[in-house]
A protein has these predicted regions:
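Post-signal peptide N-terminal segment of mature Sec-exported envelope proteins
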Residues: 34-60
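Bacterial N-terminal signal peptides that target proteins for export
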Residues: 1-13
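C-terminal motif of bacterial Sec signal peptides marking the signal peptidase cleavage site
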Residues: 20-23
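Active-site-proximal loop/hinge segments that shape catalytic or ion-binding/gating pockets
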Residues: 17
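Core segments of small alpha/beta cavity-forming domains
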Residues: 62-135
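Structured, amphipathic secondary-structure segments that form assembly/contact surfaces
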Residues: 105-216
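Bacterial signal peptide processing site
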Residues: 25-28
Length: 216
């Protein structure tokens, strides 16, 4: 899949999809190129234990309701560093949808998996739902992951695709359910720049997205 340069702005989350957010990336490829923008990172830990991603730090337990099924296809790598990126990238995405469903733009779980600047971007995306009293329902597959590591393996680019064809938003007050407008490409490519913090957690530094980018 060809991946051209994408604009790195918080508005990308709000404008590329009428519906949902995910990312597009990472299976097994690595690169010697440095990953721009994914340097040292920081985050605030949550209180509970969590899925293992290759370190001893306690990660938050992310809980999603049965009304929203977020599935990850082929989310494995034989490289342990790439697998750690995949694991934390997966939980970062799950934490974002948890924040939307719980109507919580200040989500500590999401903040755990973001740098400070990354969390500001995440909050803008989350508020595109919470400010409109929207939650998410349905099924959202996440697939075609790809990880590219920097030379020192302290930064990475995680890309992946999502298919929004069976996912919808629901208004918390009226109950109105909406999917994407007719004719909208349901697949969205996401590219997440990530950095490894002092605790060994891979955090999102910034995100880029392109609707229809998965077919390129």
């Amino acid at each position: 899949m060809a991946r051209r340069a994408l604009t790195t702005t918080a508005a990308a989350f709000a404008t590329t999809a009428a519906l949902l957010l995910t990312a597009c990336g990472g299976g097994g490829d690595s690169s010697s190129d440095d990953i721009k923008g994914a340097g040292n990172s920081s985050g605030s830990p949550s209180a509970s234990a969590s899925p293992s991603a290759g370190s001893e730090v306690k990660r938050p337990v992310i809980k999603l309701p049965s009304s929203f099924q977020l599935t990850f296809e082929n989310w494995t790598s034989s490289d342990p560093v790439e697998q750690a990126v995949l694991n934390d990238g997966k939980e970062q995405l799950r934490a974002g949808y948890e924040a939307i469903i719980e109507n919580d733009p200040e989500s500590k779980d999401r903040a755990f998996y973001d740098t400070k600047n990354g969390f500001l971007q995440s909050q803008q995306w989350i508020r595109t739902y919470t400010d409109k009293n929207l939650t998410v329902i349905g099924k959202l597959p996440v697939f075609d992951p790809k990880v590219i590591l920097s030379k020192d393996k302290a930064a990475a680019s995680l890309s992946y695709c999502t298919d929004e064809s069976k996912a919808s938003t629901r208004n918390r007050k009226t109950g109105e359910v909406k999917g994407n407008p007719a004719g909208t490409d349901p697949e969205v490519l996401y590219v997440i720049s990530m950095g490894k913090n002092a605790q060994g957690v891979w955090q999102a530094v910034s995100a880029r997205s392109e609707r229809g980018g998965c077919a390129k």
